[in-house]
């Protein structure tokens, strides 16, 4: 950490000065935020990615929300990526007699049956996982209803399809509550039939940008999902959510196969000891940073803002520490989907991110990234790291990357420059003018989960030489950057682009 002083800490909050955090913000859209008016407010407040949670809602409901988002993007001119978060495989308790909650008392014994037709009572409850008596053994723990009920396994009878347990605490159990089996390897598919229907029936037709996959347990899960996507796989990023011990154990192979990663601390926090969650978060973020894959930190980041206009001090510190750990994105769930202050939550999250980013020692981060990158570097990685080194040495205010698919700009982002990266998605040029629109926004929207990357869409052309057309695009990019207050006349800007077969890094002075 750097740039920390007493005066800076004590300085009163300043009015909004136009600064935008490098860290991206993912917002879950729901009843509190799905209107065109509120979605516009979230976009202006700093939302970069809209999350559609398919654990809730119908296709028609989500379609209406997406249509509202598209209208809001058109009205504001702000680009936003679309994330489909799958419900994933789950184990739930069954229905209860008369639909009434039951009281479980500490020390009492209860039988669990895999016959889901049985209506539960204090002596017997059902669970939806058929192989429960096969995979559990005496001494295992079963957590129900978000961990509020702990059951210890006493015996298993696979033939009868039952498990005998002891209740470790007094609590009330309602119908269809979630179940976690810490440390138990379960035999459930990563994609359920519902997930496939959501992805192929809603996600693919709507050209979504990314899928957040719940309960990824091994690298082959991602290979199978890409097979399901078929030809659409190349346009949809896969974001893995590791939410159990098996996934943590296989983290490295999952990281090799995934496009992005989400540290989903909710279910993970019930699978591993609560005092180890911070270690898992730091390990996952660090490993994602080393390979240049974007990582989202999620769950309960500003949870109290569902009801309160101010976060708790612990929540504010949690968001800042995720930024210091190296996260690319921070995420709001209930805060933006169903909270009383969705816009304020985004604004506060953005302010916290800006403060945390200003305290980072970017020189030390760059050295660590260089030290940890295997040699020899690929030509593209060598160029990307050199562009960041040049920007650091020249005290540049901005890095501009002209790219067709976005991969060069993403590699620049891996080296965490202290300045923003303007990623200009360059089309094939064919006319005499340059216009800031693009028929295919996919590469630009994919950039919206990388820290520090600001994508700009370009469509246009020049019948001139490659070198001349590049200069036209670069000049337009610098003009756009000036309008966005990313730089001003007299500032040094590092540009990275290709001319023919050669790659060029140069320092430009903004006119």
Swiss-Prot record:
Gene Ontology BP, a term: glycolytic process
Query: Any idea which GO molecular function terms this record carries?
Result: ATP binding; kinase activity; magnesium ion binding; potassium ion binding; pyruvate kinase activity
Judging by the UniProt lineage, the source's domain of life is Eukaryota
Self-association and partners: Homotetramer.
The residues that hold ATP are 53-56, 92, 177
Record-listed E.C. numbers:
2.7.1.40
Q: Where does Mg(2+) bind?
A: 243, 267
Protein name per the record: Pyruvate kinase, cytosolic isozyme
Reactions it catalyzes:
pyruvate + ATP = phosphoenolpyruvate + ADP + H(+)
Name the major location: cytoplasm
């Amino acid at each position: 950490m750097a740039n920390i002083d007493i005066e800076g800490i004590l300085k009163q909050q300043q009015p909004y000065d136009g600064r935008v955090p490098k860290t991206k913000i993912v917002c879950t859209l729901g009843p509190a935020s799905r209107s065109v008016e509120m979605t516009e407010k979230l976009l202006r407040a700093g939302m970069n990615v809209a999350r559609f949670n398919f654990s809730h809602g119908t296709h028609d409901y989500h379609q209406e929300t997406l249509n509202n988002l598209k209208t809001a993007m058109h009205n504001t001119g702000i680009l936003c990526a679309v994330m489909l978060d799958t419900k994933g495989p789950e184990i739930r308790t069954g229905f209860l007699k008369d639909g009434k909650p039951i009281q479980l008392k500490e020390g009492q014994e209860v039988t669990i049956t895999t016959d889901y037709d049985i209506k539960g009572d204090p002596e017997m409850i059902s669970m939806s996982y058929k192989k429960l008596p096969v995979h559990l053994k005496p001494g295992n723990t079963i957590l129900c209803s978000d961990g509020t009920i702990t059951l210890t396994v006493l015996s298993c009878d696979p033939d009868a399809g039952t498990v005998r347990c002891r209740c470790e605490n007094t609590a009330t159990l309602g119908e269809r509550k979630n179940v976690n089996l810490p440390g138990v390897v379960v035999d459930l598919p990563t994609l359920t039939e519902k997930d496939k229907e959501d992805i192929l029936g809603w996600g693919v037709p709507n050209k979504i940008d990314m899928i957040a996959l719940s309960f990824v347990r091994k690298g082959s899960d991602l290979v199978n999902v890409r097979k399901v996507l078929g030809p659409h796989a190349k346009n949809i990023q896969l974001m893995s959510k590791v939410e159990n011990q098996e996934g943590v154990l296989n983290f490295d192979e999952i990281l090799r196969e995934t496009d992005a990663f989400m540290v989903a601390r909710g279910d993970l926090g019930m699978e591993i000891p609560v005092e180890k969650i911070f270690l898992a978060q730091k390990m996952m973020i660090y490993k994602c940073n080393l390979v240049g894959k974007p990582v989202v930190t999620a769950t309960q980041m500003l949870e109290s803002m569902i009801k309160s206009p101010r976060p708790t001090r612990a929540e504010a510190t949690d968001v800042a520490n995720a930024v210091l750990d190296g996260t690319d994105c921070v995420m709001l769930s209930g805060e933006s989907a169903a909270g009383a202050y969705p816009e304020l939550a985004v604004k506060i999250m953005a302010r916290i991110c800006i403060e945390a980013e200003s305290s980072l020692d970017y020189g030390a981060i760059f050295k660590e990234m260089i030290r940890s990158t295997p040699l020899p570097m690929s030509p593209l990685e060598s160029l990307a790291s050199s562009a960041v080194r040049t920007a650091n040495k020249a005290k540049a205010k901005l890095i501009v990357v002209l790219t067709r698919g976005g991969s060069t700009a993403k590699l620049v982002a891996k080296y965490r420059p202290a300045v923003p990266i303007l990623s200009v998605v360059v089309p094939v040029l064919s006319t005499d003018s340059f216009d800031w629109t693009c028929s295919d926004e996919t590469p630009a929207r994919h950039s919206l989960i990388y820290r520090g990357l600001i994508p700009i869409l370009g469509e246009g052309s020049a019948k001139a030489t490659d070198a001349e057309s590049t200069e036209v695009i670069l000049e337009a990019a610098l003009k756009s950057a000036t309008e966005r207050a990313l730089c001003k006349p007299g500032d040094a800007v590092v540009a990275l682009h290709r001319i023919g077969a050669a790659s060029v890094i140069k320092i430009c002075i903004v006119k």
